[in-house]
């Protein structure tokens, strides 16, 4: 489980897609890798990935065809920035919400409005997920825990505050 509070931004240093899925290598930037072990989970843009190899500054993970398709990971490219979060511990304080790392859908940004220091994003709402998207409820976008501020037909609005934008 994760919290949706991003610990670091890394970069994809390798993306090797084959018929069974993909093997990726993520350069972890400022993510503390000192306590990482084989088999640990690291959310990468909100996608729960299992560490199959690692060193002090990177980890490798296998990505299934299902994950490639459902998450849009198939379009990711070498050098792309990704949000990173290690799995939470039972003693961890979390300021986001419980995040499984299992991606349900891809949403499209429909429009962006600036309001003072905040930024409002209107996103498309997949029809099959509409019953589960509630105003003032939590949602995870690219691994970031956010609050749904408004609903309108087949859309929902998120507001990003300056602190989140700065991170």
List the predicted regions and their residue ranges:
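Conserved loop->alpha-helix
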Residues: 1-167
């Amino acid at each position: 489980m994760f919290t949706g509070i991003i610990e670091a931004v890394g970069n994809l240093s390798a993306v090797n897609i084959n018929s069974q899925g993909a093997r990726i290598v993520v350069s972890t930037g400022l993510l503390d890798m000192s306590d990482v072990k084989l088999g640990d989970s690291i959310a990468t843009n909100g996608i729960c990935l299992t560490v199959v190899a690692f060193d002090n500054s990177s980890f490798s993970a296998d990505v299934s065809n299902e994950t490639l398709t459902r998450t849009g990971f198939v379009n990711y490219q070498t050098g792309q920035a990704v949000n990173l979060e290690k799995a939470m511990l039972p003693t961890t304080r979390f300021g986001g919400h419980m995040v499984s790392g299992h991606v349900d859908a891809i949403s499209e940004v429909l429009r962006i409005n600036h309001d003072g220091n905040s930024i409002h994003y209107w996103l498309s709402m997949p029809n099959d997920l509409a019953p589960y998207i509630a105003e003032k409820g939590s949602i995870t976008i690219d691994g970031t825990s956010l609050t749904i501020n408004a609903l309108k037909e087949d859309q929902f609005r998120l507001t990003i505050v300056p602190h989140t934008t700065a991170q």
